Protein backbone atom coordinates (compact mmCIF):
# COMPACT_ATOMS: atom_id res chain seq x y z
CA UNK A 1 0.00 0.00 0.00
CA UNK A 2 1.42 3.37 -1.02
CA UNK A 3 1.98 5.81 1.81
CA UNK A 4 0.39 8.98 0.51
CA UNK A 5 1.35 12.14 2.28
CA UNK A 6 -0.24 15.50 1.76
CA UNK A 7 1.62 18.78 1.41
CA UNK A 8 3.57 19.97 4.43
CA UNK A 9 3.63 23.61 5.50
CA UNK A 10 6.09 25.19 7.91
CA UNK A 11 4.26 28.20 9.36
CA UNK A 12 6.28 30.58 11.52
CA UNK A 13 4.52 32.95 13.91
CA UNK A 14 7.20 35.58 14.52
CA UNK A 15 7.16 37.03 18.01
CA UNK A 16 4.95 34.23 19.31
CA UNK A 17 6.09 32.70 22.57
CA UNK A 18 5.00 30.72 25.62
CA UNK A 19 4.76 31.90 29.20
CA UNK A 20 2.76 30.64 32.17
CA UNK A 21 2.10 34.23 33.25
CA UNK A 22 -1.19 35.64 32.00
CA UNK A 23 -0.96 39.30 32.96
CA UNK A 24 0.23 41.30 29.97
CA UNK A 25 0.48 38.08 27.93
CA UNK A 26 -1.30 38.75 24.62
CA UNK A 27 -0.87 35.15 23.46
CA UNK A 28 -2.46 33.68 26.59
CA UNK A 29 -5.28 36.22 26.71
CA UNK A 30 -6.21 36.17 23.02
CA UNK A 31 -9.10 34.17 21.60
CA UNK A 32 -7.48 31.76 19.14
CA UNK A 33 -9.85 28.83 18.58
CA UNK A 34 -7.94 27.37 15.63
CA UNK A 35 -4.60 27.55 17.45
CA UNK A 36 -6.17 26.06 20.58
CA UNK A 37 -7.65 23.23 18.51
CA UNK A 38 -4.24 22.40 17.05
CA UNK A 39 -2.75 22.19 20.54
CA UNK A 40 -5.57 19.96 21.77
CA UNK A 41 -5.64 17.53 18.85
CA UNK A 42 -2.02 17.21 17.80
CA UNK A 43 1.34 16.51 19.47
CA UNK A 44 3.32 19.63 20.30
CA UNK A 45 6.37 20.70 22.23
CA UNK A 46 8.27 23.84 23.22
CA UNK A 47 11.62 24.75 21.71
CA UNK A 48 14.31 27.16 22.84
CA UNK A 49 14.80 30.15 20.54
CA UNK A 50 17.66 32.07 22.11
CA UNK A 51 21.27 31.78 23.18
CA UNK A 52 23.32 28.74 22.27
CA UNK A 53 20.24 26.86 21.06
CA UNK A 54 20.20 29.03 17.94
CA UNK A 55 23.93 29.67 17.64
CA UNK A 56 24.03 32.91 19.62
CA UNK A 57 26.13 33.79 22.68
CA UNK A 58 24.64 32.54 25.97
CA UNK A 59 21.83 34.71 27.27
CA UNK A 60 21.31 36.62 24.02
CA UNK A 61 17.73 36.99 22.83
CA UNK A 62 16.91 35.23 19.58
CA UNK A 63 15.71 36.89 16.40
CA UNK A 64 14.09 35.86 13.14
CA UNK A 65 17.42 35.68 11.29
CA UNK A 66 18.91 32.95 13.45
CA UNK A 67 15.62 31.24 14.20
CA UNK A 68 14.70 30.77 10.56
CA UNK A 69 18.25 29.68 9.70
CA UNK A 70 18.31 26.94 12.34
CA UNK A 71 14.84 25.69 11.43
CA UNK A 72 15.76 25.55 7.76
CA UNK A 73 19.03 23.75 8.48
CA UNK A 74 17.48 21.37 10.99
CA UNK A 75 20.38 21.93 13.38
CA UNK A 76 22.11 24.64 15.37
CA UNK A 77 24.04 26.91 13.02
CA UNK A 78 26.69 28.93 14.83
CA UNK A 79 26.32 32.59 13.91
CA UNK A 80 29.13 34.69 12.45
CA UNK A 81 29.32 36.56 15.75
CA UNK A 82 29.90 33.36 17.70
CA UNK A 83 32.46 32.13 15.17
CA UNK A 84 34.42 35.38 15.46
CA UNK A 85 34.10 35.31 19.26
CA UNK A 86 35.51 31.79 19.21
CA UNK A 87 38.41 32.82 16.97
CA UNK A 88 39.25 35.76 19.25
CA UNK A 89 39.31 33.46 22.29
CA UNK A 90 41.51 30.87 20.58
CA UNK A 91 43.78 33.44 18.92
CA UNK A 92 42.85 32.37 15.38
CA UNK A 93 41.37 35.82 14.74
CA UNK A 94 44.79 37.40 15.11
CA UNK A 95 46.22 35.02 12.49
CA UNK A 96 43.65 35.98 9.86
CA UNK A 97 45.53 36.40 6.58
CA UNK A 98 43.40 39.23 5.17
CA UNK A 99 43.52 41.27 8.37
CA UNK A 100 47.26 40.80 8.73
CA UNK A 101 47.85 41.75 5.09
CA UNK A 102 45.93 45.00 5.59
CA UNK A 103 47.88 45.83 8.73
CA UNK A 104 51.22 45.01 7.12
CA UNK A 105 50.39 47.21 4.15
CA UNK A 106 49.50 50.13 6.42
CA UNK A 107 52.78 49.73 8.32
CA UNK A 108 54.90 49.27 5.19
CA UNK A 109 53.52 52.32 3.41
CA UNK A 110 53.01 54.43 6.55
CA UNK A 111 49.29 54.70 5.86
CA UNK A 112 46.36 55.25 8.17
CA UNK A 113 44.16 52.31 9.10
CA UNK A 114 40.40 52.85 8.91
CA UNK A 115 38.19 50.57 11.00
CA UNK A 116 34.50 50.81 10.17
CA UNK A 117 31.49 48.86 11.29
CA UNK A 118 28.41 48.63 13.46
CA UNK A 119 29.08 50.05 16.93
CA UNK A 120 26.63 48.03 18.97
CA UNK A 121 26.22 45.34 21.58
CA UNK A 122 22.97 44.16 20.02
CA UNK A 123 24.76 40.95 19.03
CA UNK A 124 22.58 40.46 15.97
CA UNK A 125 24.84 41.84 13.26
CA UNK A 126 27.88 42.85 15.26
CA UNK A 127 29.80 42.96 18.52
CA UNK A 128 31.97 45.84 19.66
CA UNK A 129 34.44 43.28 20.96
CA UNK A 130 35.40 42.51 17.36
CA UNK A 131 36.40 46.13 16.73
CA UNK A 132 38.32 46.13 20.02
CA UNK A 133 40.26 43.06 18.84
CA UNK A 134 41.17 44.89 15.62
CA UNK A 135 42.40 47.85 17.65
CA UNK A 136 44.59 45.51 19.73
CA UNK A 137 46.09 44.12 16.52
CA UNK A 138 46.81 47.64 15.29
CA UNK A 139 48.43 48.51 18.61
CA UNK A 140 50.67 45.44 18.50
CA UNK A 141 51.80 46.37 14.97
CA UNK A 142 52.72 49.87 16.09
CA UNK A 143 50.20 51.69 13.91
CA UNK A 144 49.92 55.32 14.94
CA UNK A 145 47.05 56.56 12.76
CA UNK A 146 43.95 54.46 13.30
CA UNK A 147 40.54 55.96 12.61
CA UNK A 148 37.28 54.36 13.72
CA UNK A 149 34.11 55.05 11.75
CA UNK A 150 31.10 54.15 13.91
CA UNK A 151 27.92 52.89 12.27
CA UNK A 152 25.14 53.46 14.80
CA UNK A 153 22.63 50.69 15.42
CA UNK A 154 19.07 51.95 15.34
CA UNK A 155 17.50 48.50 15.20
CA UNK A 156 18.96 46.24 17.87
CA UNK A 157 19.76 48.78 20.60
CA UNK A 158 17.55 51.13 22.68
CA UNK A 159 16.45 54.48 21.19
CA UNK A 160 18.71 57.47 21.82
CA UNK A 161 21.55 55.25 23.07
CA UNK A 162 24.15 56.12 20.43
CA UNK A 163 26.18 58.38 22.72
CA UNK A 164 26.75 55.45 25.07
CA UNK A 165 28.25 53.27 22.35
CA UNK A 166 30.40 56.02 20.87
CA UNK A 167 31.66 56.85 24.38
CA UNK A 168 32.52 53.18 24.94
CA UNK A 169 34.53 53.15 21.71
CA UNK A 170 36.37 56.32 22.69
CA UNK A 171 37.13 54.88 26.12
CA UNK A 172 38.52 51.70 24.58
CA UNK A 173 40.72 53.68 22.18
CA UNK A 174 42.05 55.68 25.13
CA UNK A 175 42.61 52.54 27.19
CA UNK A 176 44.52 50.80 24.40
CA UNK A 177 46.40 53.93 23.41
CA UNK A 178 45.45 53.60 19.76
CA UNK A 179 42.67 54.85 17.50
CA UNK A 180 40.19 57.69 17.55
CA UNK A 181 36.56 58.04 16.49
CA UNK A 182 36.67 59.85 13.15
CA UNK A 183 33.05 59.71 11.99
CA UNK A 184 29.58 58.63 13.02
CA UNK A 185 26.74 57.55 10.71
CA UNK A 186 23.51 55.60 11.05
CA UNK A 187 23.16 52.07 9.70
CA UNK A 188 20.16 53.24 7.65
CA UNK A 189 22.70 54.89 5.36
CA UNK A 190 25.96 53.01 5.90
CA UNK A 191 24.49 49.50 5.85
CA UNK A 192 21.64 49.77 3.34
CA UNK A 193 20.99 46.33 1.91
CA UNK A 194 18.37 47.30 -0.66
CA UNK A 195 20.86 48.74 -3.18
CA UNK A 196 19.63 52.29 -2.66
CA UNK A 197 22.71 54.15 -3.83
CA UNK A 198 21.37 57.52 -2.65
CA UNK A 199 21.70 56.27 0.94
CA UNK A 200 25.14 54.73 0.54
CA UNK A 201 26.39 57.83 -1.28
CA UNK A 202 25.41 60.03 1.66
CA UNK A 203 27.28 57.71 4.03
Where do the language-model regions lie?
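Active-site nucleophile/metal-coordination loop of metallo-enzymes that catalyze phosphate/sulfate
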Residues: 2-9, 16-189, 198, 202
Amino acid sequence: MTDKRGPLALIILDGFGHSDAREGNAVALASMPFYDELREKYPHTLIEASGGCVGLPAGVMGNSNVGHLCMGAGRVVRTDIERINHDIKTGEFFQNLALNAALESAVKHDRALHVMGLTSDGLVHSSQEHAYALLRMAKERGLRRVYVHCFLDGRDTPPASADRYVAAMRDKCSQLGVGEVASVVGRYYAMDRDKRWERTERA
